[in-house]
Amino acid sequence: MPDKTEYLLAINCGSSSIKGKLFAIPSFELLANLAVTNISSADERVKIRITWEEGKGKNSEEEADYGDKIRYASLVPILLDHLTNSTHVEKEEIKYVCHRVVHGGTHDRGIRVVKGHEEGLIEMDKLSEFAPLHNHRAVLAVKSCLDALPHHTSLLLFDTIFHQTIAPEVYTYALPPSDNELSMPLRKYGFHGLSYASIVRSLAEHLKKPSDQVNVVVAHLGSGSSSCCIKNGKSVDTSMGLTPLEGLLGGTRSGTIDPTAIFHHTKDAASDANVGDFTVSKAEIILNKNSGLKALAGTTNFGHIIQNLDPSKCSKEDHEKAKLTYAVFLDRLLNFVAQYLFKLLSEVPIESIDGLVFSGGIGEKGAELRRDVLKKLAWLGAEVDEEANNSNSGGTVKCITKEGSKLKGWVVETDEEGWMATMAKEEFGF
């Protein structure tokens, strides 16, 4: 009688979506992609989609209630039901589930959690104040997984792990001792680490070199944006800090501003405000949810901002807003990219720098932004290949600079779920 098939599920819980991938054990074969979208939306219904690799199962896509009507904790069980109903996979056969958790503090490896031994979840929930839009929801997802799959082992994998190689002089904040009881030190931690790790692997494979020889600057640009300086495959600096708020502006995040600005902007900035079932300051709500592209352009959709750069496509007011927003975004991005390229160039010759990578939704789709960034880097020998840059094809890794360009430009698709699965494979030894 053949051995019973077992599975690994990688789950990536965001504030507006859940993504996942299902792998066979021990072959590590990718079987299916999972997605839940429109979470928390008052205007659109939640969509649950299961897409199987050819011959592995029956694809399915269904709509549920409106996003703001569905409890977040119920979404993972709903997703599991759709998964098991679309093929022969049984819930009892899902042996491991790995979860993306944004903030892991100083942890340099994942944490295992099983039903009845959930101490790690308590620790992670304490860090929710530092990543209020992500950590708490990830904890809810893990708890719902433990209830739906009581036999399995969950592995919590943190975006902050990749940045544990950052030196003290880079991560230290010049603050006096705190009079608060802190759940972790106040310092730079950095985020998007699972994405950066997957990009290093993909670029190394494309260049046919070991990951520990990759020297690159990455711009992960999406609803949340950050940049990272990577030397010998390891993070040496990154734009996000104690929380994802520091650094580049995002869809609704302000990015780095003078810390006193919020107290002039809002009189009761330090007062409490509720986010679901926990409390943060009003300042954190304004800076995390009401700022960024939304504040400057009135939209979080970067594609709409690009469209409104054409004055014939919108009102004069929207055109002026789009021009300023785009200029601000480009300026802040160049500040970090140039800084990180300088860091690399101060230690390795330009011939040993693998280039500048664009990733994330904006990075992968924003041909105009990529061109404008690379043109500003012409002094380093960057030469844009217009045809490659404007093309929508090219695979996981695509070069967008000319053959003789001294500084290479790349578009690399990120694969957080795939990297999580790799980490789980190493952790569990299958």
From Swiss-Prot:
Q: Which reaction does it catalyse?
A: acetate + ATP = acetyl phosphate + ADP
Q: Where does the signal peptide begin and end? A: none
Q: What is its EC number?
A: 2.7.2.1
Which SUPFAM superfamilies does the UniProt entry name for this protein?
Actin-like ATPase domain
The alphabetized UniProt keywords are:
ATP-binding, Kinase, Magnesium, Metal-binding, Nucleotide-binding, Transferase
Give me the residues that bind ATP, please. Answer: 19, 220-224
Where do the catalytic residues lie?
Answer: 159 (proton donor/acceptor)
Where Mg(2+) is bound, by residue? Answer: 12, 416
Tell me the residue numbers annotated for binding substrate: 100
What PROSITE patterns does the entry give? ACETATE_KINASE_1 (PS01075)
Q: Which molecular function GO terms apply here? A: acetate kinase activity; ATP binding; magnesium ion binding
* Classification via PANTHER family: ACETATE KINASE, ACETATE KINASE-RELATED
Q: What is this protein called?
A: Probable acetate kinase
- From which organism does this entry originate? Cryptococcus neoformans var. neoformans serotype D (strain JEC21 / ATCC MYA-565) (Filobasidiella neoformans)
What is the phylogenetic placement of the source species in the record? Eukaryota, Fungi, Dikarya, Basidiomycota, Agaricomycotina
